[in-house]
Amino acid sequence: TDLMMPGEQSPVDEIIAGVKNGRISETTLNKSVKYVLKLISKSISNKGWEYNEAPDLAANAALARRIATEGMVLLKNDRSFLPISQGAKIALFGATAYKSIAGGTGSSNVNKAHITDISTGLEKGGYTLSNRLKGLYTKFVEFQNDLLDKHPESTDWEKLSYNRTVIAEMDLSKAESIIGQEAKNSDIALIVIGRGSGEESDRRLEGDFYLTPEEKFMIENVSSQFHAAGKKVAVVMNVCGVMEMNSWKDEPDAILLAWFPGQE
């Protein structure tokens, strides 16, 4: 590691002491300094760029959108299912589709002017979403948000709102008939799986590295009922970090790893 997170004097004191007592060689230290300076030399501030109060926000937004798109990874695409035909009617499943994750937590979080949810992006792209599912999930997301907004006493390091960066998944086992109805009335199904991610910790196993019971039910039953109707299913992963996929990757026809795509 050539660069540590700045902010405290203690690491600086440790490095100086390490060089003085011989635990760290000056050659090793100079090598790290060289790499950091090399990185700085490549920055735009070192190439004549001047700060201004009127950045080209439209160009920056277009660049952010292009980078997000180019960074996505198509993990599976049986019989070239994706891209979806323009104007298709989509049954959009998954709470994260209606409250999508733009970035991570902690130091990976940045201020965002807005967040374009996956549902909104699809509609702007000319696709038609199931109004039934849109209404159902919108109410569910509002209810989940209320759990945080109406309980400020739960805001601290250990309680609900600090640890809750992703909307919980809706339990479709209590409304299984909706899946069959959507399989009849929609052209395809998209399922969105979401996971938060931040620094200084690994994933828990149950319900984090592995799918939750609600997510398993959703993928299995949406896939089986849409396939029975001769229609295809894709899973979009709005995640950052590792997840177990081997147990369910054969269910959908396509899997797109969208990562955390930012505000656009």
Task: Give residue ranges: language-model regions.
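C-terminal non-catalytic regions of proteins with extracellular/luminal or membrane-system context
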Residues: 11-24, 58, 62-264
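Hydrophobic faces of well-ordered beta-strands that scaffold small-molecule active sites
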Residues: 2-5, 233-235
